[in-house]
C-alpha cells in the first residue's frame, strides 16, 4: 500500500482527490435510491446537486477534511473519507457491493490516518445499515452510543449508531 498526500494505492484501488469532472460518474451513484438508502441526504435528483457536492469535496481544506474518490480499473466506484475529521464515511456504487472494495479502501484510509498521527476515527451509521455495521466491526470500530431522530432525510427521521476507532 502506498499513499501520498493526494492519493492512496491499494492492491486493487486508487483513492484520489475529487476532480470537477467526477460529477457525472458520482451522480450515477448519488442519484441511485438503493445506494443512497442510508446516506445523510436524499438521492440527488439533478446533476447540478452532485456538481456542487463534488466542487465542495475538491476545494476542501485538507487540514479539516481528508476525502477521496475511490476508483477501480480507472472507473469511479465511490467515495471514502472524512468530510469533517475525525468523522468519516463511505459510499459505493451498488454494482461493487459485497466484493471487499469498501473494506480494502477503509483499511488503507485507517492506515493513512494512523501514519498522519490522528488519534481516532469516528462514524455515524444508520442502525439499519447492516453491511456498514459489519465492515466497521471488522476494522475494530467500537460502538460508543445510539441516538434517535438524528437525521432528517427527505420525509424520514433516521437514527444513529456512533462508532469510534482509536488509532
Protein language model regions, located:
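Conserved catalytic-core motifs of GNAT/GCN5-like acyltransferases
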Residues: 124, 142-159
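GNAT-family acyltransferases
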Residues: 1-95, 108-112, 116, 120, ...
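Residue-level recognition of the GNAT/N-acetyltransferase active site
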Residues: 93, 124-128
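Conserved active-site tyrosine of GNAT-family acetyltransferases
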Residues: 136, 141, 163
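Conserved acetyl-CoA-binding loop-helix of GNAT-fold acetyltransferases
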Residues: 97-115, 130-138
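Residue-level marker for beta-strand->alpha-helix junctions and adjacent short loops that shape enzyme
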Residues: 87, 128-130, 148
Amino acid at each position: 500500500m502506498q499513499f501520498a498526500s493526494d492519493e492512496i494505492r491499494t492492491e486493487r484501488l486508487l483513492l484520489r482527490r475529487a476532480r470537477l469532472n467526477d460529477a457525472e460518474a458520482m451522480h450515477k451513484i448519488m442519484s441511485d435510491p438503493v445506494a443512497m438508502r442510508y446516506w445523510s441526504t436524499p438521492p440527488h435528483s439533478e446533476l447540478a446537486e452532485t456538481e456542487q457536492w463534488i466542487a465542495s469535496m475538491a476545494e476542501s481544506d485538507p487540514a479539516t477534511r481528508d476525502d477521496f474518490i475511490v476508483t477501480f480499473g480507472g472507473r469511479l466506484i465511490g467515495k471514502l473519507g472524512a468530510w469533517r475529521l475525525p468523522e468519516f464515511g463511505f459510499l459505493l456504487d451498488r454494482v461493487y457491493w459485497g466484493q471487499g472494495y469498501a473494506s480494502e479502501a477503509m483499511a488503507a484510509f485507517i492506515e493513512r490516518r494512523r501514519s498522519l498521527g490522528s488519534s481516532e476515527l469516528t462514524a455515524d451509521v444508520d442502525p439499519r445499515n447492516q453491511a456498514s455495521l459489519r465492515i466497521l466491526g471488522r476494522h475494530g470500530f467500537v460502538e460508543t452510543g445510539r441516538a434517535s431522530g438524528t437525521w432528517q432525510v427527505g420525509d424520514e427521521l433516521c437514527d444513529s449508531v456512533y462508532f469510534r476507532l482509536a488509532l
